[in-house]
């Protein structure tokens, strides 16, 4: 196999591996109280537009169950902005945290109207919740 062909397959594999290891590392770093806080914050700030249940419905925004590791803009039945559809790297815990800090700054042109979550601890808790749901 030529180096060009191998590299075409290596990059997506490496990106997927990094996303998966990021999720595993985050899940092991999150204590139960932090995940519980994240669930509360999700209910307070996110649940009006998003669900996070396996096979849950799409509301105004996409179902966030399994978001870490998923490619942005790919969940069926959701109308995404071109800006979101153009994102190619899978969501990581760090990417989710950056997005919920300031969605418009992270992905200019996103349809998400949320102003953002300023507190880093709260962002970490929400990310822990999303990473830990089964």
Language-model features: locations:
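C-terminal capping alpha-helices of c-type cytochrome domains
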Residues: 90-134
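Electrostatic cytochrome c docking/interface patches
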Residues: 25-43, 52, 57
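Short cysteine/histidine-rich zinc-coordinating motifs and their immediately flanking basic loops
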Residues: 58-63
């Amino acid at each position: 196999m030529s180096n060009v062909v191998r590299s075409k397959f290596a990059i997506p594999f490496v990106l997927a591996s990094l996303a998966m290891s990021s999720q595993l590392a985050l899940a092991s770093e999150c204590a139960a109280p932090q995940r519980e806080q994240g669930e509360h914050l999700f209910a307070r700030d996110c649940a009006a537009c998003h669900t996070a249940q396996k096979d849950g419905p799409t509301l105004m925004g996409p179902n966030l169950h399994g978001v870490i590791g998923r490619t942005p803009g790919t969940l069926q039945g959701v109308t995404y902005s071109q800006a979101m559809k153009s994102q190619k790297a899978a969501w990581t815990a760090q990417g989710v945290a950056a997005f919920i800090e300031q969605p418009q700054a992270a992905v200019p042109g996103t349809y998400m109207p949320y102003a953002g979550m300023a507190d880093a601890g709260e962002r970490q808790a929400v990310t822990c919740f999303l990473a830990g749901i089964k």
